[in-house]
Amino acid sequence: MRAHIYVSGLVQGVFFRASMQEVARSLGVNGWVRNLPDGRVEAVLEGEEGAVLKVIEWARRGPPLARVERVDVEWEEYRGEFRDFYIKYR
């Protein structure tokens, strides 16, 4: 399963990316996460359906300092292009 997500709210400067990386890796989900110039966080998640859904559910709360307002999910065809979950810097 593959999901492309956009997380809105207070999600930058609150360890969102590092926390998502930790959660995704613990669940065996591959892909990436990055900050966007408009203040949102963008991520691509690939893995088993249940694991991807758990990362999305986590993103709806985020780490303790985050204030998530919205998570938009776009479902995409699985590509299997990632071997790890990493933080992209632009």
From Swiss-Prot:
Residue ranges of every copy of the Acylphosphatase-like domain listed in the record: 2-89
Gene Ontology molecular function: acylphosphatase activity
Gene: acyP
Pfam families associated with the record: Acylphosphatase (PF00708)
Family affiliation: Belongs to the acylphosphatase family.
Catalytic residue list: 17, 35
InterPro entries hit by this protein: Acylphosphatase (IPR020456), Acylphosphatase-like_dom (IPR001792), Acylphosphatase-like_dom_sf (IPR036046), Acylphosphatase_CS (IPR017968)
Keywords of the record: Hydrolase
Catalysed conversion reaction: an acyl phosphate + H2O = a carboxylate + phosphate + H(+)
Uppermost EC category: hydrolase
Protein name: Acylphosphatase
The organism of origin for this protein: Thermofilum pendens (strain DSM 2475 / Hrk 5)
Enzyme Commission no: 3.6.1.7
SUPFAM superfamilies according to UniProt: Acylphosphatase/BLUF domain-like (SSF54975)
